[in-house]
Curated annotation (Swiss-Prot):
Subcellular localization, as worded in the UniProt entry: Mitochondrion inner membrane
Bilayer-spanning residue ranges: 13-33, 70-90, 100-120, 140-160, 162-182, 190-210
The protein's name: ATP synthase F(0) complex subunit a
Species of provenance: Myxine glutinosa (Atlantic hagfish)
GO molecular function: proton channel activity; proton-transporting ATP synthase activity, rotational mechanism
Lineage: Eukaryota, Metazoa, Chordata, Craniata, Vertebrata
Catalytic activity: H(+)(in) = H(+)(out)
The keyword Ion transport belongs to this UniProt entry's keyword annotation: yes
Amino acid sequence: MMMSLFNTFESPYFLGFPLMIFIAILISLTMFIPDNNLLIKNQSSMLASTFLKTMTKEIFSPIKKSGHSWALLLMTTLMFIFLNNITGLLPYTFTVTSQLSLNMAMAIPLWLGTIIMGATSQPSHSLAHLLPEGTPMTLAPFLIVIESISIIIRPLALGVRLTANITAGHLLIHLVSLALINLTKSLPLLFLTFSVFILLLILELAVSFIQAYVFVMLVSLYLEENLI
């Protein structure tokens, strides 16, 4: 018996170990997959390739060439978040991206990488973001503190946004599914609730991609801000 709705977001254990460890091992094993040129192309792989090319052009078109080396990393992050969001919608599965610890583990290194790139390649330009041009000297100390705080909380905003949206959607689906079970004796209400459930599921499919896209897009904006 489930004691709380949030029990579904607790990390499950397998043989006494957190399932997150096994997921990390499986992801690391993908590094040993042979080159795509050795694999047989099918419709699914061609569709995935077209999708990745389109998203790469969409995200990196406004970014200077010096930041194009981030394309592989950010596209991998997008697909990782998107596939985990989709997998979490399946019955009896664990939603990895509902864990703030995982989302922060992705957000902090990416954000820190953009900061380090800006600080090493153009330190004066990066520091100039802390004080807008034309600011009165009396307001300069306050604006520097405010801008510094806004930059520091960026990874927290990335992680919390993804966690909150995925968690809220799964809770709504869980509540509607409980209503379906309790309304089996009333066919009109059952049909209405089932229609709401299907619409909500379609919405969550869209949210799964939107949240992955927003996460990567925001990181690309941070990257663009620190490029020469």
